[in-house]
Amino acid sequence: QDSCSTYKRNIKTKAIFCEKVENFFSLVDKKKIILPKFDCFAYGFPCNDFSNVGEHLGFRGKFGPLYSYGVELIDRYHPKWFIAENVGGISSSNEGKAFKKILFDLKHAGKGYNLTVHKYKFEEYGIPQARHRIIIVGIKKELNLKFKVPKPNYKMMTAKEALSNIPFDAYDNELTKN
């Protein structure tokens, strides 16, 4: 709910579906909602059950299986490409079996996708935080394209450095009202 409220406040669009992901397809089918054609689908499924910080439950947890709703969306709507994101710990959850299953399902969704999987260390890309994330880029096989992982720039940056030189008139630089 908080994410939807933030999105509505910052992105002025009526195309916001603010329901539990588990209800998405039943509501789309029931209300005969037709989604506009889209080329890209970006999603991050809950990391709670895959994180090394948590209990590492993977598919045995409440949130682990939620990735499958993204797979179903890809199956139904066949975007040209997709990007999925999760924590680095996903690769070892359930002794690595969960990650293999997720990759298998994403690869075979729709008419099939070529996957590029990479663990990004964002501090190596000039982001002032040590967040390590697995990013999966899938491109329709029929397009005969492959995503190329960008090389790190290794320019480490502090939060102060990142925030201190933003021009006052920069796009989206207005102060928020919370």
What are these regions (language model features)?
Residues 1-23:
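SAM cofactor-binding core of SAM-dependent methyltransferases
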Residues 19, 42-43, 84:
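Redox-cofactor binding/interface segments in oxidoreductases and associated redox assembly factors
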